[in-house]
């Protein structure tokens, strides 16, 4: 049971540091790593653990996509996209809320930073929602819950950790690997249900609060917004098309021309160049080219370091703890304990969803996926759940829940800041969103809902 004690120590240190002392969570994760080194006496392996944390391709992917999101935000391309969406659906009841769901989910997928995305898109969507009758607490939660949904939508960097967890499980159990494109298709299939869930909840709240459409004076002109922003609407195509092609042709067209190894490594490298191509395209379509000179771009990134650093630090320290826990067998011990309880399929799904929800209150989702991902996949597969679906749900049950579940629900606090909403009212309203997220997670994992790509 020592392994479970180590898990308890990690959770306790992060709780005290983050909740008690109000310090950044990445500091808490690093401190937990240091405390665990002292408790377990594994100082001799510290360089190996650091090497594991720094050698993952996740770091480059995170930096590349967050850098792209900085370019999109600073050059006002995001504003153009939001204006186009508002001009199309703002005239319907609750249109500002639907715009927040769609725009925030897309931008959240690019940035991988829930709080940062809330601040970027919420500065436009939250005031628009409030002006049309959304209560402040509801506007804050729509924005925060939609932004954190980006953690489960490709190309979010959280997906890389989930793919790595599936690869680890597949190698250990003799299962054939799937292409990155195929994995992403399944992730989009899963994400579609959660986007629909949020849209339905917005519709329900609009009925309850009698929300109005946006006034004609506030609505952007369709012709003008399309004239300015039509090029920006091609960004999703540029980002998604390589993965769709990889999923469709990885086993035939690419194999015939590149060979099996060439097709395999092409699939693995898609994530590495998509962000760069999209960033170049973003710079090319900017009307005022003086805003994207090398000097201005360098300044953008310099000012955005504070946005990038915390997320990367959490992932690096999480991988370091994951490497240590792998040596200590912590995840395996947890898996053996849960297996001994002889859960039914529904029982196992409820248990894992509950565990990730509770841990998500203090442990970042990316760290959960790194440390426990392969074990969660194995436990779910043992009760009859497709391991590919289990892996595709990891960013959801870990990454999304950690962002919307208080007290670590940083997105809620960011939304409250913009909406100037009351904490008690925002917290109570947020519980509806957390509950709906939990129920839908169970429904998808149980196979009650069909998932495109499976």
Model-derived segments and spans:
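Structural signature of hydrophobic alpha-helical transmembrane segments
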Residues: 1-8, 57-61, 189-193, 326, ...
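N-terminal alpha-helical transmembrane segments of multi-pass membrane transport
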Residues: 1-66, 70-86, 204-217
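Long, contiguous bundles of hydrophobic transmembrane helices that form the permeation core
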Residues: 2-10, 29, 35, 168-307, ...
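Hydrophobic alpha-helical transmembrane segments
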Residues: 4-9, 27-30, 59, 63, ...
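Membrane-embedded alpha-helical segments and adjacent helix-loop junctions characteristic
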Residues: 41-127, 291-383
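Juxtamembrane helix-boundary/capping and inter-helix hinge elements in multi-pass membrane proteins
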Residues: 76-77, 91-94, 127-139, 165-178, ...
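Alpha-helical transmembrane segments of multi-pass membrane proteins
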Residues: 94-109, 132-155, 174-186, 192, ...
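C-terminal transmembrane helix pair
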Residues: 188-189, 316, 345-354, 358-371, ...
């Amino acid at each position: 049971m020592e392994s479970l004690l180590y898990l308890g120590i990690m959770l306790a240190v992060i709780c005290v540091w983050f909740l008690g002392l109000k310090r950044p969570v990445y500091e808490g994760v690093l401190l937990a790593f240091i405390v665990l080194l002292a408790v377990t006496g594994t100082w001799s392996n510290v360089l190996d653990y650091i090497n594991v944390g720094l050698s993952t391709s996740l770091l480059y992917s995170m930096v590349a996509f967050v850098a792209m999101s900085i370019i999109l935000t600073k050059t006002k391309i995001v504003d153009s996209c939001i204006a186009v969406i508002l001009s199309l659906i703002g005239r319907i009841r609750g249109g500002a809320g639907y715009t927040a769901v769609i725009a925030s989910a897309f931008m959240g997928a690019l940035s991988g930073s829930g709080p940062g995305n809330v601040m970027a898109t919420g500065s436009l969507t939250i005031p628009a929602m409030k002006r049309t009758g959304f209560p402040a607490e509801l506007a804050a939660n729509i924005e925060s819950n939609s932004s954190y949904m980006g953690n489960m939508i490709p190309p979010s960097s959280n997906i890389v950790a989930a793919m790595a967890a599936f690869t680890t499980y597949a190698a250990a159990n003799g299962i054939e690997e799937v292409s990155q494109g195929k994995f992403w298709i399944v992730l989009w299939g899963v994400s579609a249900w959660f986007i629909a869930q949020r849209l339905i909840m917005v519709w329900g709240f609009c009925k309850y609060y009698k929300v109005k459409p946006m006034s004609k004076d506030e609505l952007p002109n369709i012709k003008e917004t399309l004239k300015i922003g039509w090029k920006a609407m091609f960004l999703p195509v540029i980002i998604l098309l390589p993965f769709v092609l990889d999923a469709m042709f990885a086993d035939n067209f690419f194999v015939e021309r590149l060979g099996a190894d060439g097709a395999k490594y092409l699939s693995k490298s898609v994530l590495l160049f998509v962000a760069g191509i999209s960033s170049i395209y973003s710079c090319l379509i900017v009307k005022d080219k003086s805003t994207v000179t090398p000097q201005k771009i360098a300044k953008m990134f310099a000012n955005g370091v504070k946005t990038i650093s915390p997320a990367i630090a959490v992932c690096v320290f999480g991988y370091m703890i994951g490497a240590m826990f792998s040596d200590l067998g912590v995840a395996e011990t947890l898996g053996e304990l849960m297996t001994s309880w002889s859960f039914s399929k529904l029982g196992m799904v409820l248990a894992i969803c509950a565990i990730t929800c509770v841990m998500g209150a203090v442990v970042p989702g990316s760290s959960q996926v790194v440390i426990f991902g392969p074990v969660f996949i194995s436990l779910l597969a043992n009760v009859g759940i497709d391991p590919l679906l289990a892996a595709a749900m990891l960013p959801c049950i870990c990454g999304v829940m950690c962002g919307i579940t208080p007290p670590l629900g940083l997105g809620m606090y960011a939304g409250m800041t913009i909406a100037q909403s009351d904490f008690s009212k925002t917290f109570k309203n947020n519980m509806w969103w957390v509950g709906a997220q939990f129920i839908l997670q169970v429904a998808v994992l149980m196979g009650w809902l069909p998932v495109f790509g499976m």
